[in-house]
Amino acid sequence: MTKMYINTIIEYIDSNIAYSPIVFFSLLILAGLNVPISEDAIVLMGGILSSRKNEYTILIFLGIFWGAYLGDIISFYIGKLMGNKLFKNKKDNNLLDKINYYYGQYGVLTLFIGRFIPFGVRNAIFMSAGMGNMKSNLFIVSDFFATLLSIVVYFTLSFKLGQSFEIIFSKIKIIIFAIFIAVIATTIIIYVIKKNKKVDKNLK
């Protein structure tokens, strides 16, 4: 029975894979707005899906790249326009101070390194760039190449991973289903935790 449900869901994903570039693009735009969505999980899923449906590889890649890149720009302008109001927490300020130190030491190289760091550090890097003295044009140009580099690397690795699964595992559908469920579950859990923290703060 479980296998039947898994196959039904995977078949539904396969039959609607043409919409995946739009879905991935939209999710990454939301991530740029600080919605707790994992860019790494999306790139992983996109690469694996592309390895199974080669005809959609370019579209999926473009959806992920432009979503990630525009999401970065959104984060930059959030920092530029609203950063001082948003980051009143001491821990947030300490993180931003560290990032600003690296910007001072290494300049735009910080963007290239930061693009490979997961767990919400990316957005902090982009926002601190907006809050600092980095010019918009410099960020937009530098981040274009930083995003291109990181997405190409992660997407290629995910694509190769998907191909390896096809060779090693005959039941690749179950693995993709598990990743799909894990992404959804992680997003929901992070959202609930953040919401509970806000409720606790209001009660205090």
From Swiss-Prot:
Cross-referenced InterPro entries: DedA-like, VTT_dom
Is ATP-binding found in the keyword set? no
**Pfam families in the record:** VTT_dom
Record-annotated membrane-spanning stretches: 17-37, 58-78, 101-121, 139-159, 172-192
Q: What is a single cellular component term in the Gene Ontology annotation?
A: plasma membrane
How is this protein positioned relative to the membrane? Multi-pass membrane protein
Name the job this protein performs. Answer: Required for proper cell division and envelope integrity.
What's this protein's name? Inner membrane protein BB_0250
User: Where does this protein come from, organism-wise?
Assistant: Borreliella burgdorferi (strain ATCC 35210 / DSM 4680 / CIP 102532 / B31)
